[in-house]
């Protein structure tokens, strides 16, 4: 898994990043275009793979900060025995039981890089023929191209057993492939997150709740894996500045600027 930064549309539209996956066993490829490489594109593209093929045993990727957090581990993470802080992507992989393997050299990324070289030739030509000039159009071309690519380059696995796991029936991927942030529950049952205030309507004894921001942008609050009822607290409009009489204000300024004796005012 990796992201390819390339002028895929050859100047006809915005710069795009191709999030690509290639299966070690069969060379099956899955990919999707995004406007940047980051946590949400990584989670969204991984979701596409899981929905199509199942949950892989491991995922091989580079040391991009999306996939490997540069931050020092928190106290909670240290108590859990982690030597490094987890990125949102690492946390999601851990919850799904997927081993994360980081590439330590350019040679270790050779397979995905060779795939990108192929796509930068073949796929770019398809995009050119379709006159794709936007993110949506590029993904439409990609959806038509990938089955043809896999039909040509896909191989039989050395072992017939598919090591992908099915998504458990009770597992909602939305609760895993999302952005999770722990927030303090205030005494008035409110939670603050990214400039918004949410009022939790359930009675809780907990001091913290988890804020889930899903890939569609929606917000969900959970506590101990239970969904919470809440409502957004409307923000109060900023107070208007006091009205000032322009005549009195000008008189006051004149006194400050020109009066040498207070009796002159």
Question: What is each PLM-predicted segment?
Answer:
Residues 146-265:
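C-terminal, beta-rich DNA-binding module of retroviral/retroelements integrases
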Residues 121-128, 132, 143-158:
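Short helix-capping and hinge/turn segments at secondary-structure transitions, especially at repeat
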């Amino acid at each position: 898994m990796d992201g390819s930064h390339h002028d895929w549309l050859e100047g006809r539209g915005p710069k795009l990043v191709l999030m690509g996956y290639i299966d070690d066993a069969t060379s099956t490829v899955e990919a999707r275009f995004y406007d940047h490489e980051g946590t949400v594109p990584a989670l969204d593209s991984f979701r596409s793979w899981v929905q199509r093929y199942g949950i892989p045993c491991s995922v091989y990727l580079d040391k991009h900060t999306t996939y490997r957090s540069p931050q020092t581990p928190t106290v909670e993470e240290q108590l859990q025995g982690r030597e490094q802080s987890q990125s949102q992507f690492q946390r999601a992989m851990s919850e799904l039981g997927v081993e994360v393997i980081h590439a330590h050299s350019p040679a270790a990324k050779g397979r995905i890089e060779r795939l990108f070289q192929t796509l930068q030739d073949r796929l770019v030509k398809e995009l050119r023929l379709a006159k794709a000039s936007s993110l949506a159009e590029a993904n439409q071309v990609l959806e038509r191209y990938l089955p043809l690519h896999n039909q040509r380059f896909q191989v039989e696995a050395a072992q017939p057993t598919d090591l992908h796991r099915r998504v458990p029936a009770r597992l909602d991927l939305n609760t895993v492939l999302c952005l999770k942030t722990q927030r303090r529950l205030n005494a008035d049952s409110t939670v603050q997150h990214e400039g918004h205030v949410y009022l939790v309507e359930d009675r809780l004894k907990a001091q913290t709740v988890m804020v889930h921001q899903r890939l569609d942008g929606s917000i969900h609050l959970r506590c101990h894996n239970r969904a919470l009822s809440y409502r957004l607290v409307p923000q109060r409009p900023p107070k208007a500045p006091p009205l000032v009489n322009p005549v009195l204000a000008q008189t006051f300024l004149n006194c400050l600027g020109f009066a040498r004796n207070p009796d002159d005012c």
